[in-house]
Amino acid sequence: MQLMTTSEIYAVGVPIILMMIGLEVIFSVYKKRDLYSLGDTGGTLGLLTGNIFVSLSTQGLMLGLYFYLYQFRLITINDLFPPWLIILATFLTVDLVFYWYHRASHRVRFLWAIHMNHHSSTEMNFSVAFRQAWFGPLSKVPFFLCMPIIGFDPSITLVAGVCSTLWGVVGHTQWIDKLGWLDGIFNTPSTHRVHHGSNAEYIDRNYGNLLIVWDRVFGTYAKEESPVIFGLVDNVGTNNPVAITFHTWASIIRDVRRARSLYEVCGYIFGPPDWIPAIKPDSDAPLQSLTSLSIDQGSEFR
């Protein structure tokens, strides 16, 4: 089975993406929309630089791990199905695994500490797709280890992953309006704007990367209706990539240091970003609620 290499895919995809960004900038200036700002774009470039460095530093090890695990695969998918079905199955499985990785990155606090970097922009444009966390290349590895074990060829999985990543760029724009029935099947600009919204009705919605049907199946789908407010519920207030990267980690460390038990330590690290320990009914202290959270905790919420 002959597929394009990742280098060939990037050679085609990157110029197209750069052209899209250029056209969006022209559109922004012409329509006086202010879709881009120098500070926000600078923060994105700082985060992207760190992400690329970590990715290049670890990709050999990660690929080696995938191919090592492939030796112990449960089935050999390449021997069971025709090429077109292998490619289709790989793309669908990559997208499904990504859905759960993405969902976990919003609902597990230490993963959110990484992923919130991507949501730290209060803008929505094609360049925001490249606002990637420094530790992002590492956080997704455990989720995708299942693929070589099941029997998906790592070389095909890699190609599918690159294609899916490039498709994800398309969703980061205000330039393209709703697309009707396509919004209910694919991750379109409309559905992904919802995902980046800090509106209460949009929080933790639309995790899909290629297909949005996973969200419809697992109950996390939302249509774009009210105007989207981009960013975090409480924004970090800086474009410094170092400050953004360690913003939530700092609050996790503070919470862990004041934890009263191992249970609370685990809750602060592995629980949802808005997790707080319950107050015992017989305690003299008032019952805690989300409204009594510290500023440090609240500032990381979506």
Residue ranges and their predicted role:
Residues 16-28, 91-96:
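Central hydrophobic cores of alpha-helical transmembrane segments in multi-pass inner-membrane proteins
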Residues 68-78:
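Membrane-interface helix termini and inter-helical loops of multi-pass transporters
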Residues 12, 35-52:
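Loop-to-helix transition at the N-terminal end of transmembrane alpha-helices
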Residues 22-42:
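Membrane-interface helix-loop junction between the first two transmembrane segments
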Residues 2-17:
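Hydrophobic transmembrane alpha-helical segments in integral membrane proteins
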